[in-house]
Each structure stands twice: as structure tokens, then as C-alpha cells.
Amino acid sequence: VNFLDNVGNYIKTFDTKQNDIVVESKGEEITNIVNYIVQTAKEENVSIPQLWLPRIPNMIYTEELKAKYNYQAVTNNINPIIGEYDDPDNQRQMLLTLPISKEGNTIVYGSAGSGKELMLSSIIYSTITSHDSKEVNFYILDFGAETLTMFRNAPHVGDVILSTEKEKIDNLFKMLNQIIEERKKLFVDYNGSYDFYINHGGKQIPSIIVMINNVEGFLDTYNEYEELMGQITRDCLKYGVIFILSTNGPNTVRYRLRQNFKQNVVLQFNDASDYGTIIAGVRKKEPSKVYGRGLIALEGIYEFQTAYAYKEEKLTEYVKIICEKLQTICEYQAKSVPTLPEVVTSSLLKNSFVNLQQVPVGVNKETLAISTINLAATGMYTITGEDISSSTQFLESWMKLLQSRDGIKCNIIDANNILNKNNLGDIKCSDADQLENTLNEIYEDTKSVHIFMILNINSILNKLNVTDKGRITGLLDKVKSKTNVKIIIVDTIDNIKTISYEPWFKTNVSLSEGIWLGNGIANQFTLKVTTSSRVLRAEVETNFGYVITKGKAALTKWITEE
């Protein structure tokens, strides 16, 4: 650039060439402004409230949630912690509990691997660590991975039943029906309600929670119980009985049964459209792909995370330790599901031996109660069957049980020597020729109760002449005046039929009472049995028979030696 004066002379000259300066690009201006503000805020330690809370962690623990939310259990109100839910609209995260006592039956939904067993274990753990075993009892049917067996030793848990234990499953439902019938009668004066009974002066009785893990597996194997479950779950809450089921899909539980379940807990489904089948108004909302995440419908629809009882890798060990500690704390042990013992022993029956009105002989197969007979009603009692020689173990074991009771003396006449005398201990067992002497001896002793068993009496009488037979039958008939003597007549049904018309027998024996050994009871007409012949024609196993009481026959497993 040249500067000139007024006559054209150069006054000053400048060089306009500039050096190129490279400036680093830092992006758009608005971005740099924001970054500058953020950096300045950090330096000045300035912050503003977040729009939402941090997401719930993948691993949360029941005990930590109890402390965080100051959870306090209420006696007889079963409301266990199951996790924590997120309510971003109101910027809050809240404790998630399952109001079992209030809302009752519950279904836990979720695809395989979604955390259903975690949810069930959380329900059990939170309940047993917050309530006494007098308040709540669990009966668990584990048709899944069988991980719930870790709770087996808790005093609150009556039984953990696996898929192969058919007898226990049968007996559980019998027991539930019995409990409900008993409570119906018990609650008559308390508005027919468990809650009203508990809160208004009734005795403490536990809520019963029946938990079925993998209910579709249960119903596939035992589909005969679907209708019964529908009947029980319809009104069971008012009797203090609650069902909790877990299932893989939204339609695996039929609507007729599903309508009896008020609460739904939904974990992850493989198909996003399945959420709307269970939760109305869910739209496109889905839980995060995290184990134990799910959706729950409360005031709105919220995502939740299931709580762990303990660190996953040590969960089983921890739960077993807790169960052992609870055993030392809780005085009451939940009643186990009764089962028919493999061997009915004297130790099992002896406490039921109250008096001659209740003499135990075995276990009722249907009710699993101790079967008893009444020896006090008449002077004689009959034990019969098509073949008595196959039931000698029962006869020997039963007589030893009678002999073990103070004040009772037992004697046996074994006409055909079918018993093993070595198995009778100190019981006197004589041959047929000692019948008269034995009768005279026991009639003379009025201080003791005498149980006198005569086997194959018909063969004894058939060998006697008219005079001797008259003398023996006269002695037998004398028992009606001896209240301390009871004669047990053991013979085949054909022989019982032969002597049933004789006066000494008719006077002292009731044919609507007695014991039948083995099969064939439906083929005879000597004993007065009113039970359906269709029932009586069923095949009877070894060591089984019928106790006949007032004409009704009850299938019974007999006492045998241990």
C-alpha cells in the first residue's frame, strides 16, 4: 500500500502480505458454548437437580431394602418384600411388596431365564425372616430346577414336593380340603373370615401358602388337579389359604383358573406383545433385559427389579444357614404332608393306644390317620379273610403291641401252628388242647385285661365230640359276663360263615365290625359291609386289608415288625 502527497510523491509504503495462521477447528459454535458452560460449572462446583433418578441396580438385596425403606412387618399381615420399582414421572423409587394377605392368589409370569425362581425365593425368604412360623406356613411344589428345596428345613415350610412324589401331591390336596372344611366350621361365628377370626379373639392359626413353581409342568403331569385347583382357589383366601403360581407364558394357565388370581407379577417375555395380554394399558412398555426385571401394575405401570436374598453364588448356602437359625427361634413347626409309611411300626401306633375303645391296628390309606378298632363294645371280635396264613406278620406284631401296654396280658391258641413263636416275645402261645385250660385261667384273673386270640377255631371245634364241644362253646359264651376279657376269633371267611349261626357266636360278635385281611371282601356276604363293592374289588397290596366299623370298610395298612 503506497501513500502519496499532493504533488504525487511517495510518503509511506506498507507491505499487505500476511502470514497464514492455522487455527484448530473445535466444531460448531453452539457445541463449544455448551462445553464451555459445563466446564465452568464443574470448576465452580455448580449443579442442577437431575430430571430422573439413577436406574435401579441389577443386584439389590432384601436386607438392604429393609434398612433403606425402614420396612416393618405387621403380625398376620403377609406382605413380603419382592424388590424395588421405578416411578420416573414422579422422580421416585419405591419399595415393592406383595400384599398376599390382602390380595391373595398370585401368578408370576416370565419366559425361561427371566427370574421366576428368584422371585419365588424372594417371596419365601422375606416372609420367613419377617414372620413367625405360627403366622404362615408354606407348601412348595417345585416342578422347575428344584432350587426351592433350599428352604426345606425352615420351620415355616411344611414340605417341598418334587414332580415324582405323587403320593405327597395327592395327600397335600386332601390336607388342603380338610383344612378348608375345618376352618369353615371354625369361622362360623367370625363372619366366615380368616382375617376376622385372627383379629377378633380367635386362636392363632397360620396362613397357608401353596406355591407351585412351573404350574404348566404340574398340570401336564397331574391334569386331574386342574378342576380341583379351580374349586379351591375360588374362595380359599377367606379361609387363610393362598396359591402362588409361576408360569412361562401368558396363556399357559387357562382363563377359568386364571380368573381366581387377583395379582399378576410379570417378568420378561420373549414376545413383547405378551405384556399387554396380562397388564392392561401397557402399550409398548417393556422391562430392561436384565435378570429379575419386570413390570408391575400399581397406580400406574412400573418397571421393577427383583430382590436377591443374598449374593447369587452363595445364596443356597446362606438360605440353609438362615433356616437353621429360624429352627432355634420358632417354636412351631409347620405340619408336614402326611404319607403312608413303608412300614407301620409299633412306635408309630403306641401313642394312639388310649384304651380298649381305641386299639390301633395300622394306618388308614385314604386319610393317613391311625386306624383303630373298638374291643370294648363286645366280648368277641373277628379277624378274617380268604387266607389268614399270609397275614401272620400282622397278627404277631399286633399282639406284641397289645402286650406292651401295662395291665394287658395276651394269650394265643394257634390250632394249625401258622405263627412263628420266636416272634411273639413273652406272649404265651399254646396248641389247641390248651384252649379250655387257658379260658379257665384268664376267667379267674379279674385284675388284668386279657386279650385272647384263637386261630382256626373251627378246626378245633370240628375235632370235638358233642359233649366236649358244648363245654368249650359254653366257656366261650361266658365271655359276655367278663368285661376284662376280649376274645379275638381269627379264621377264614368260610369257617366264620359256618360258626356264625351258632348261639355263642351270635351273642358275642357283631358282623358289622371286624378286620378283613387281604383281597376278596367284595366276594363274601357274611360280614355286613355297606361300602360300594366297586371300591372293595380293587386289588389290595401285601400287608393291607380293611377295618370294618359300623359296616363301613376302610382300607388300612397293617402294623408289621420294624
Give residue spans per PLM region.
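Generic detector of well-ordered alpha-helical segments enriched in charged/polar residues
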Residues: 31-39, 170, 258, 275-279, ...
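P-loop NTPase catalytic phosphate-binding loop
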Residues: 68-192, 200-269, 286, 347-512, ...
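Conserved AAA+ ATPase core "coupling" helix
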Residues: 172, 271-281, 510-513, 518-531
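Phosphate/diphosphate-binding loops
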Residues: 273, 278-298
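Conserved AAA+ ATPase "sensor/coupling" helix adjacent to the nucleotide-binding pocket
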Residues: 179, 183, 280-287, 530-535
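Short, highly charged low-complexity linear segments
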Residues: 239, 273-276, 547-553
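Conserved P-loop NTPase motor module
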Residues: 1-102, 218-221, 225-227, 263, ...
